[in-house]
Swiss-Prot record:
Listed InterPro entries: Trypano_VSG_A_N_dom, Variant_surf_glycoprt_trypan_C
Signal peptide per UniProt: 1-23
Protein topology in the membrane: Lipid-anchor; GPI-anchor
Organism: Trypanosoma brucei brucei
Keywords, in A-Z order: Cell membrane, Disulfide bond, Glycoprotein, GPI-anchor, Lipoprotein, Membrane, Signal, Trypanosomiasis
Name this protein carries in UniProt: Variant surface glycoprotein ILTAT 1.24
Annotated localization: Cell membrane
Compositionally biased intervals (Low complexity): 455-464
Keyword Cytoplasm: no
Glycosylation sites: N443
Length: 514
């Protein structure tokens, strides 16, 4: 009887041990795996975020480029105006923004690729770890606990974000949920240690400890240093029945020791991807953009350069910076809005590819192709204008040369013998002449007495006056016929002709500058 009681007691102890062991078969708590599935879904947005970021920079570049071309279009039509100088100065400042944005785009593509690679790796690791727990079921028992710990959580896995990747044909531009991915880390992935990650008991044998060496015992020999690592460190068991989760909430603070892990690198690459662009902010108007440009050093430097180029001075000669800013941009950029209104309402030619002479308002031109055609049109118009001016100058020079060659003075100067000179009705021989003068010179008095007209050409008339002015002292050299210059009394009409020719040439040169 005693033996039977002892045997029954032994059996009860064994059954109790089995029940206790079975009761310790903990799965993974819903609050542990659900945020990781949510993070998986957010990380998979990275390709769309990268597309949005690169497109945003490209659109900013395009917006600035169109603004630049509109400013240059007005300046091309009125190249010598004060407005044109101002617009070219704004364009110079805008070019600095374009260069910075171009560099940002080049770097942005690299950031986009890196962020997408790291985020994809992290999302894949999270999904595969939780999928392993999902598949550890026989239809009755399970390793993923549902919310509330009372049932199987497998059915909720997909709805929480853990499902096979399926990209659309066209990536959707997206943005992150900042409750899941913040500027510091992954806020919902806070640490769960010891027994904090245990799900429903008696359901999952995955984290069962081996009672001895793994070679001869089932389970994991945690006492020997073995551990279970799911999702590249997202779920880790270093002790029996204790699935844990690392701290990934703040990589600059509490999760600093995780910064060099896959998840830390994924977050760092995402942060770099989200850096602000250099271009205009969404919704920024042309006037706002131009006012910001007017404040840049490059705009003021351009004004000084253009003024120096048109006057022959050096840029360092222009020192009154505030006065220059006020003159061209207005006090606190007050001239900018009126300038832009004038630009956008101006009608220009060249936008129509079929009819270049057709006019269009600058505000209606919103493609690079249209604006480039306008710039080409005015480039051709300027070229033709310069060619016509060069032709007119050459013609004028020829006419002046012809007039000088046919003047009475020139005809007399050709005679080198005194008898022949004296025989001419309009010439007289001068024995004593100054250096560079001819002996045979025109004599208007003799020509008049001989009945020869002395107003044959403009130059001839001037030479008649030259005879009157010749030899006079400074006191007697008076206008309108004579003018004292270079120590001698000269015909003022000849000086006027020379000044006229010089002014024409100067005007042509100024036109070439712009």
């Amino acid at each position: 009887m005693v033996y039977r009681n002892i045997l029954q007691l032994s059996v009860l102890k064994v059954l109790l041990i089995v029940l206790i062991v079975e009761a310790t078969h903990f799965g993974v708590k819903y609050e542990l795996w659900q945020p990781e599935c949510e993070l998986t879904a957010e990380l998979r947005k990275t390709a769309g975020v990268a597309k949005m970021k690169v497109n945003s920079d490209l659109n900013s570049f395009k917006t600035l480029e169109l603004t630049k071309m509109k400013l240059l279009t007005f300046a091309a039509k009125f190249p010598e105006s004060k407005e044109a100088l101002t617009l070219r100065a704004l364009e110079a400042a805008l070019n600095t923004d374009l260069r910075a944005l171009r560099d940002n785009i080049a770097n942005g593509i690299d950031r986009a690729v890196r962020a997408t690679a790291y985020a994809s790796e992290a999302a894949g690791a999270l999904f595969s770890g939780i999928q392993t727990l999902h598949d550890a079921t026989d239809g009755t028992t399970y390793c993923l606990s549902a919310s509330g710990q009372g049932s199987n959580g497998n059915a909720a896995m997909a709805s929480q974000g853990c499902k096979p990747l399926a990209l659309p044909e066209l990536l959707t531009e997206d943005s992150y949920n900042t409750d899941v991915i913040s500027d510091k880390g992954f806020p919902k992935i806070s640490p769960l240690t010891n027994a904090q990650g245990q799900g429903k008991s008696g359901e999952c044998g995955l984290f069962q400890a081996a009672s001895g060496a793994q070679a001869t015992n089932t389970g994991v020999q945690f006492s020997g240093g073995s551990r279970i690592n799911l999702g590249l460190g997202a779920i880790v068991a270093s002790a029996a029945q204790q699935p844990t989760r690392p701290d990934l909430s703040d990589f600059s603070g509490t999760a600093r020791n995780q910064a060099d892990t896959l998840y830390g690198k994924a977050h760092a690459s995402i942060t770099e991807l989200l850096q602000l662009a250099q271009g205009p902010k969404p919704g920024q108007t042309e006037v706002e953009t131009m006012k910001l440009l007017a404040q840049k050093t490059a705009a003021l430097d351009s004004i000084k350069f253009q003024l120096a180029a048109s006057t022959g001075k050096k840029t360092s000669d222009y020192k009154e910076d505030e006065n220059l800013k006020t003159e061209y941009f207005g006090k606190t950029e007050s001239n900018i809005e009126a300038l832009w209104n004038k630009v956008k309402e101006e009608k220009v030619k060249g936008a129509d590819p079929e009819d270049p002479s057709k006019e269009s308002k600058i505000s209606d031109l919103n493609t690079e192709e249209q604006l480039q055609r306008v710039l080409d049109y005015y480039a051709v118009a300027t070229m033709l204008k310069l060619a016509k001016q060069a032709e007119d100058i050459a013609k004028l020079e020829t006419e002046i040369a012809d007039q000088r060659g046919k003047s009475p003075e020139a005809e007399c100067n050709k005679i080198t013998e005194e008898p022949k000179c004296s025989e001419e009705k309009i010439c007289s021989w001068h024995k004593e002449v100054k250096a560079g003068e001819k002996n045979c010179q025109f004599n208007s008095t003799k020509a008049s007495k001989s009945g020869v007209p002395v107003t044959q050409t403009q130059t001839a008339g001037a030479d008649t006056t030259a005879e009157k002015c010749k030899g006079k002292g400074e006191k007697d050299c008076k206008s309108p016929d004579c003018k004292w210059e270079g120590g001698t009394c000269k015909d003022s009409s000849i000086l006027a002709n020379k000044q006229f020719a010089l002014s024409v040439a100067s005007a042509a040169f100024v036109a070439l500058l712009f």
